[in-house]
Design a protein with these regions (language model features):
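Short internal beta-strands
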Residues: 19-20, 249, 312
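Short, surface-exposed secondary-structure boundary micro-motifs
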Residues: 70, 228, 278-279
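Cytochrome P450
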Residues: 1-173
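Short glycine/proline-enriched turns and hinge-like loops at secondary-structure junctions
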Residues: 46, 59, 77-81, 199-201, ...
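Short, compositionally biased
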Residues: 78-88, 237-246, 285-298
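Ferredoxin-reductase
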Residues: 173-272, 289
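FNR/FR-type flavoprotein reductase catalytic core
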Residues: 261-312
Length: 312
């Protein structure tokens, strides 16, 4: 079920499928993202062993519960843009499809590896595979497990890559056991613009190299910039609704450890660097009746984005 769900998800989101065909190193995190958005284990039934209260709801002893953990995989408080399939999401592995704590799936790493091998084999040998158009999907009649009863695909054997290069049959990619390494999950971006905004302040405007939309972000979000052996976190600013670019402003610290100096002095317009995120550790509660925003020093950047959001 998990593998069928993954193929259905990736072939439905064609850009994601093409991304792992071009860069198979994305496959491990693609597996985690598919388990998040279309996991094969969606709910468990439980019986309360004692009177309790959860989220303000009283649950009596003996009460029968249907715990739909798949809903947590779309919690916007934890996952940025939860409805989107994002192969570069750096916390995809925090899905609950394998459960959590003492009762999590003992075979999760075997399952991960099986899914990776399936995807690697198909992307290497049948990158042109497509879902048959017009089909409808019937799912298992089950409250706990979810997967399509059947998945119809099609391809043209004349386009199989091994016809032009038989050597690819002997070049499967190997994967490490376990969850993907978080720090390896970065996307390439090009520095579209570089601006001197003041003494020691540099604004970078970042875009996808192929002009594809970048992830949406919420007020208070940051990204990790990776270049020149440095990895630094910078708050996002600029126009949130413009998904063609992401913007950061960097303060050059002359006496720092070298990260800000590198991004301010060595990075130029036209350069390609890497980025992780966005991620929000300072989420704005827009339901509050009023807000008082206080910041000093580096904290002013996310606060400005929050002020812009509240003003809008």
């Amino acid at each position: 079920n998990a593998t069928a769900n993954a193929f259905m998800t990736l072939l439905t989101h064609r850009e994601a499928w093409e991304a792992i065909c071009e860069n198979p190193a994305l496959i491990p995190n693609a597996v985690e993202e598919c388990l998040r958005v279309a996991g094969s284990i969606i709910a468990w039934r439980r019986i309360a062993t004692a009177d309790t209260t959860v989220g303000g709801v009283a649950i009596p002893k003996g009460g029968k519960l249907l715990i739909v953990q798949a809903s947590a995989n779309f919690d916007a408080r934890h996952f940025e843009n939860p409805q989107e399939v994002d192969l570069y999401r750096d916390n995809s592995v925090e899905h609950l499809t394998f459960g959590y704590g003492a009762h999590q799936c003992m075979g999760k790493n075997i399952g991960r590896m099986e899914m990776r091998v399936f995807l690697e084999e198909f992307t290497r040998r049948l990158p042109h595979i497509r879902l048959v158009e017009g089909q409808s999907f019937d799912f298992l009649l089950n409250t706990s497990f979810r997967g399509p009863a059947e998945l119809w695909v099609e391809w043209d054997p004349r386009r199989n890559p091994e016809r032009a290069n038989p050597a690819i049959l002997d070049k499967p990619l190997s994967f490490k056991i376990g969850a993907p390494v978080k720090d390896d999950i970065t996307r390439a971006v090009v520095v579209r613009e570089r601006h001197e905004e003041g003494e020691g302040l540099v604004r970078l405007v970042l875009a996808d190299p192929r002009g594809r939309p970048l992830p949406a972000w919420s007020a208070g979000s940051h990204v990790d910039l990776v270049a020149g052996g440095f990895r630094r976190k910078y708050s996002l600013c600029g126009i949130r609704d413009d998904r063609s670019v992401l913007e950061v402003v960097i303060l050059r610290e002359a006496d720092g450890r070298g990260g800000s100096r590198h991004f301010c002095d060595a990075v130029a317009a036209g350069d390609t660097i890497h980025l992780a995120g966005p991620k929000n550790l300072f989420r704005l509660d827009e339901s509050a009746p009023r807000h008082v925003l206080i910041a000093g020093g580096i904290g002013i950047t996310p606060i400005l984005a929050m002020a812009d959001r509240l003003k809008a």
